[in-house]
Amino acid sequence: MNRNEAITALVNYALEKELIEQEEKVWAVNRILEVMQADSFSWEESAKGKEAGLTEILDTLIDDAYERCVLEENSVVYRDLFDTKLMGSLTPRPVQVMKKFQQLQEESSQRATDWYYQFSQDTNYIRKDRVAKDIRWKTETEYGEIDISINQSKPEKDPKAIAAARNQPASDYPRCMLCEENVGYAGRLNYPARQNHRIVPVTINNTDWYLQYSPYVYYNEHCICFNKVHTPMKIDKACFAKLLDFVRQFPHYFVGSNADLPIVGGSILAHDHFQGGHYTFAMERAPIETEISFEGYEDVKAGIVKWPMSVIRLNAKEPERLIDLADKILGSWRGYTDEAAMILAETDGEPHNTITPIARRRGEDFELDLVLRNNLTTPDHPLGIYHPHEEFHHIKKENIGLIEVMGLAILPGRLKKELEAVEEKLLSGENMTEDPLTKSHAKWAADIAANYEITAENVKEIVQKETGIVFSKVLEQAGVYKRTPEGKEAFLRFINQV
């Protein structure tokens, strides 16, 4: 494909996806020419152009720009900034997107989100080709089938771009990755371009919020709902009310919040936000293990969930009852200490107890899962007692956030090559301690070798299964009450004093 064919194909793509109207074809060509810094064009339909997918079309244009020195470097960071600028030139204006979403929402919230999710892929804001590279599988555990993924969709930064980014002046704009200032932002070497990014307003519990999708799509229709105001994460009564109001308006979605303390919280604590989507996690499928009840709330069904972490599930017809009871449990947990169970509410004035809440609809009912969290550290566990312990850092050492709490492991990209190397050495019997790719996995791999009859046909399946089992053990470590008779007794001690 030459440049003219690629521009023609991109305009046809924008027409097909309804990003532009038929009458805007000439305008669209000129927008693309401006980005390409090219001043000649003739409309060229070609078989190649008609067959090409969006990634191939954009790659052709980026290569052309690099060959003509319009693009300074040919690395992923520069290419991403450039192709986002190209797509941004064809993305409808923010108000057009908002109006379309609101118009569809009047028909049904699901029609609105269906359209908006597809739109976010059509503009290449969600890079489907990259998301497809993520490695995913399911592992059967005593808690049901959990999801494992090795993230490949976040591109690795190249050394040249990292070096160039160091020389850029510091900037506090946009204030963070979530703020509405990202809409249409051109990006820079150390900040992603967002010209093709559009958000839609939603009112939750009488406050102004926005809805968008995650560009990394860890699960189906992975959305982010964020406060219009850049304000810190806070788990409180208003948070429960917002979560339940969200699932009232979008009953086909679940929504949850990361905890509001370091170690047990998410990566963005400075901007209040939730994550949701159209997906059934293993935790949602997990049954109630022990029924419980709270005085004065006998109409609320409550129970301890059969899950590696410590989860109280509440279910009621009226969201108000859940909000009141959840607030009561939160208030009690914030101030709760049980030294015998290694739970301290605070040390030196620093609070440790919080909750990761998740809301959903169960038929017509409203349901709230409250996951008890504690971020206490000790000299033996400087990253947190209720955090992946060092023995499992070869697989997972990052924080256990909302998505993982629910049973979806987001494992680091390095594991793709490392686990492939482990598989090769399990088959060949080579020493793992001498290869930097397998060194950290050597002890774990030796246990695998001792427990299985390994063949070329089953090695991948076995390594994936054992990786999933490690993740379930990591979740057990993140649970404040262990799944032992003593742990159960301590959990009930807390519940009984609420």
Q: PLM features: residue spans?
A:
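Catalytic or ion-translocation cores adjacent to nucleophile or general acid/base/metal-coordination motifs
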Residues: 238, 247-270, 276-330, 334-337
